[in-house]
């Protein structure tokens, strides 16, 4: 049963909601912490459908939160997996150049890595062949030794166990319904919450608007799918990624080494605009109001060509199907053929934040809050990697807001 009162109420049971709850309990051990998750278990959305790649942190400019938090997040999550005995593959990542036009992008990634202290190695084409014989590159490539792979569902399950051990009330199957005079309305009754922490992912903007925030922001969902290699298909020793278009928050179709010890791979993801927030498969979870609102917004972006949306949409159409994905991946790794990739993995939804005033996608983490509530509005990749460091950073921001109130009183 839901408690009638709680000091901190966290909405959302993904990896960030769990680490936020744990960090709140660690810093305010004498306070009660309750977490709401509308699904029957935690981590059934973005966290459980994550690629499992622990990013090193060299994609981001030094002035961003992503750059500040990813390197430490990588270290802490890898150490957590070792401590708990969870699967961890320190396979590294190659970023390859498809042609001469990609070389300046490689140089920029190396510069960003140096600025944020992320270890990187610029390799010649011969060095690349020794590291991963199947990788294809033009002249040179960038290698990230700190990039790794984990099993997201096992990480989430371990954090749920940690929350239980810390006396955090984890309420699954209990949905947030809104804010009222008596407290927070949920599907299990009203909870009088001293402070609300919103980590609701796809619905973070809706929860935030109940508290007067997210006025200029809306969640724009993107569907991501991977193709899985058939059993016995050739594997790779390391992840192989293209040089991304740094103006957009997507890393492009890549070849990802899966856990399991055999080097088996998956290729993807797609990045198709979704028409409703939980458009995973078929018409399940269809919401007409969401579909109408999101479709109208996407048509407007196409008409205005916001942030190069037309080019992004056209590129996605070319890689949306199985053959398109295989063709893009074959440009990165030799020996990738359609016959070896017949199965789709679970669909994931990226809860990408859109600034509706400036008509642009938010590239960095975004949050808003006051002395009554705090809202994590943009927690997209690499938020899984950053979970521990991001939670520590955000709880510090929450503490500052609470300290102002305490000092004033």
Residue positions per predicted region:
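Glycine-rich FAD pyrophosphate-binding loop
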Residues: 25-48
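Short beta-strand to alpha-helix junction loop
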Residues: 61-72, 96-105, 142-161, 314-324, ...
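Flavin (FAD/FMN) cofactor-binding core of flavoprotein oxidoreductases
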Residues: 126-129, 218-223, 228-230, 303-379
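Helix-loop-beta segment of a Rossmann-like dinucleotide-binding subdomain
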Residues: 5, 87-97, 109, 122, ...
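Beta1/beta-strand and adjacent pyrophosphate-binding region of the FAD-binding site
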Residues: 2-16, 34
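Dinucleotide-binding Rossmann-like beta1-alpha1 core, especially the glycine-rich loop
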Residues: 52-127, 131, 138, 252-254, ...
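Helical element adjacent to the flavin cofactor pocket in flavoenzyme catalytic cores
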Residues: 141-195, 199-206, 388-399
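Flavin-dependent oxidoreductases
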Residues: 19, 185-288
């Amino acid at each position: 049963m839901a408690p009638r009162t709680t000091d901190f109420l966290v909405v959302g049971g993904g990896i960030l909601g769990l680490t936020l709850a744990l960090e709140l309990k660690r810093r305010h051990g004498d306070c009660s912490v309750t977490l709401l998750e509308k699904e029957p278990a935690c981590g059934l959305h973005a966290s459980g459908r994550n690629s499992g790649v622990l990013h090193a942190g060299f994609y981001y400019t030094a002035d961003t939160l992503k750059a500040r938090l990813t390197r430490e997040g990588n270290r802490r999550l890898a150490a957590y997996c070792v401590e708990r005995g969870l699967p961890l593959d320190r396979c590294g990542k190659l970023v390859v150049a498809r042609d001469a036009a990609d070389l300046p992008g490689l140089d920029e990634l190396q510069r960003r890595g140096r600025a944020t202290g992320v270890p990187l190695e610029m390799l010649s084409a011969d060095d690349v062949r020794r590291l991963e014989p199947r990788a294809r590159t033009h002249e040179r490539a960038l290698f990230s030794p700190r990039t790794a792979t984990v099993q997201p569902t096992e990480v989430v399950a371990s954090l749920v166990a940690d929350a239980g051990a810390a006396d955090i009330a984890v309420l699954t199957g209990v949905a947030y319904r809104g804010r009222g005079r008596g407290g927070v309305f949920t599907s299990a009754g009203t909870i009088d919450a001293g402070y609300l922490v919103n980590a609701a992912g796809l619905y973070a903007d809706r929860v935030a608007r109940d508290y007067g925030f997210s006025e200029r922001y809306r969640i724009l969902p993107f569907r991501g799918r991977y193709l899985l290699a058939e059993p016995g298909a050739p594997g790779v020793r390391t992840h192989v990624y293209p040089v991304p278009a740094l103006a957009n928050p997507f890393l492009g179709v890549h070849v990802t080494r899966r856990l399991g010890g055999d080097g088996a791979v998956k290729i993807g993801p797609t990045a198709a605009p979704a028409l409703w927030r939980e458009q995973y498969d078929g018409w399940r979870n269809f919401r007409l109001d969401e579909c109408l609102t999101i479709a109208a917004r996407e048509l407007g972006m196409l008409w205005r060509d916001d942030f190069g949306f037309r080019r992004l949409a056209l590129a996605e159409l070319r890689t949306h199907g199985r053959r398109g994905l295989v063709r893009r991946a074959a440009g990165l790794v030799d020996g990738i053929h359609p016959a070896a990739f017949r199965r789709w993995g679970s669909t994931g939804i990226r809860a990408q934040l859109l600034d509706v005033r400036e008509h642009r996608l938010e590239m960095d983490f975004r949050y808003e809050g006051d002395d009554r509530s705090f809202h994590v509005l943009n927690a997209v990749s690499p938020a899984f990697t950053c979970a521990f460091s991001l939670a520590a950073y955000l709880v510090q921001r929450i503490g500052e807001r609470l300290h102002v109130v305490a000092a004033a009183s």
